[in-house]
Amino acid sequence: FLPDAMVNYLLRLGWSHGDEEIISREDAIAWFGLDRVGKAPARFDMDKLADINSHYLRAMDDGELWALVAPLVTPTSPNAEERVTKLMPLLKERAKTHKHIAAAAGFLVHDGAPEIREDAAGLLDENAVTNLHKLLGDLPEGPWEAETLQTFLKDWLAENGLKMKDIGLPLRAALTGTKQSPSIVDVMAALGPEEAADRIRKTCKI
């Protein structure tokens, strides 16, 4: 847990300032008074602490947050920091701690085909591989941005008589090894055209 989040939570265990839940150290110093110290015994609530921690995570600078995440993921790609910080605003949306971010960012910090998790392996059946092979041959040149990729995929699906369900989850599995990740176009933009194409080729053995 982040130090400021822990201080905030411990402070609120026995003291309050109206309905304020998020209290910075500066505000705590300015507002603190013994008249608002509670008499009832406090109960340590890990879920509440995690909620407060998530607030501080979202407010934290992405570069500073990467410095906390990096030791937990042992990156091997020279592009790891760039990829993770590019997706950091999305990665920290649902994270409660920086360990959650590290777990979600694992596919970004190494190059090459990701390790496919057991629950995602079934997404890469013969039909999915055929569709990914088609997509691979039509991928636009870089640089990639999420907005332009969204338009490309929409048009590509229409041209090939497919729906997003036919390509979305298989593509996510090929690029991340998982069934869950930030938006697939954001993932593609973070990886870039060369790395994304390489992962599709290696994962699908094309």
Please give the residue ranges for each predicted region.
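Small-residue-rich helix-loop
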Residues: 62-160
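Charged substrate- and nucleic-acid-binding regions of tRNA-handling and nucleotidyl-transfer enzymes
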Residues: 143-206
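Residue-level detector of well-ordered alpha-helical segments, enriched
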Residues: 5, 48, 65, 83-87, ...
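Alpha-helical recognition segments enriched in aromatics with Gly/Pro capping
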Residues: 1-56, 151, 170-175, 179, ...
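A short, ordered amphipathic alpha-helix with a cationic face
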Residues: 38-42, 56-60, 123-125, 140-144, ...
